[in-house]
Amino acid sequence: MGPLLIDFEGISLTDDDKKLLQNPLVAGVILFSRNYQEPKQLNELIKQIRAATNERLLISVDHEGGRVQRFKQGFTLIPPAQAFAELNDLEHAKSLAFDAGWVLAMELIAFDIDLSYTPVLDLGHDCLAIGTRSFHHDADIAYQIASSMIDGMHAAGMKTTGKHFPGHGHVIADSHKETPIDDREKSVIEQDMQIFAKLIADNKLDAIMPAHVIYPAFDDKPASGSSYWLKTVLRQQLHFKGVTFSDDLSMEGASVMGNHAQRAQVALTAGCDLLLACNNRQGSLAILEQLMILDKNQSLKTNKAKLLLSKTKITFDELTKSLEWRYCRDKLTKLNEKWADYASSNH
């Protein structure tokens, strides 16, 4: 198994998709809204992916809640991260965040999906790419609510991914469209990073996804392609022992690292264990070609993806019959209603 996670276009696998999944350098897949119609179809799609290869691939999705929840019909709607703190009751917010983490993880696991790239640890709501995905602008409040959501995910049996290290919240630009630059002073950026540092010290983050953001006070490369951030800071200073993902290498924020093949090489050299390449099949194929060349000189085989597989076994039918699921779903539905009222009165 290698370091690359890929995507595909449809609601079922094509022969080309299956062939790609069988490449020994592919570690798994990331799913999007375009891959989902309704629960029965998703169940069949996951079975197709599992049957395509003898290796157990890592099946992942962005399912944070709010505007970044790829599967909606038939799933519990997870409130956006900002909604929890708007309750103005920290203990209640933490309790609901635990429930949200548990529900989002259990529902995905019930479909044999291993991982949601959750939680977002960026501070503040001004960044276009982050906005309501952030728990709070106050680092301690964000830390406490995120920690509770992580506990809920872990209770369900899902690993967690903190993103976007060392912090994407204070750049206005959207890294999907350009490479943002955070030109604040070192001390301020280091303060933003403390939420990652504390959760690493608590042993709560299983994986970390760095930002496609440049921090000139430290380095001239995006964090996703910077050995300073990924090796010196994350591994040596913060003693992070988990898995590092690149964010999507097809995003415009990664373009300063070169073409797709070059981006992959830069990210690997900088210290990314696993690479995401989405929404551009030709780009993914170029990366795979480059990885095959690199693999001849130095083995790129890695078991890092296997560390993130879920071991919980439950069917969706079993889950939805449980009182715990129904209780949590009701509470989250009420929070969604409160958030809708808040959002409409603040626009």
Where are these regions (language model features)?
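Second-shell residues forming the walls of enzyme active-site clefts
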Residues: 34-52, 57, 69, 147-154, ...
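Glycine-rich anion/phosphate-binding loops
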Residues: 37-44, 88-106, 138-144, 187-190
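Glycine-rich, aromatic-flanked loop segments that form ligand/cofactor-binding clefts
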Residues: 50-79, 97-122, 142, 149-166
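Preference for extracellular/luminal or secreted protein segments
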Residues: 1-27, 256-347
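N-terminal hydrophobic targeting/anchoring segments and the immediately downstream early-domain regions
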Residues: 1-59, 67-75, 345-347
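Short, conserved phosphate-binding/catalytic loop or strand-edge motifs used
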Residues: 121-129
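Active-site mouth loops of central-metabolism enzymes
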Residues: 3-13, 81-99, 178-190, 250-258
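Divalent metal-dependent hydrolysis catalytic cores, especially in the metallo-beta-lactamase
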Residues: 28-34, 114-120, 272-275
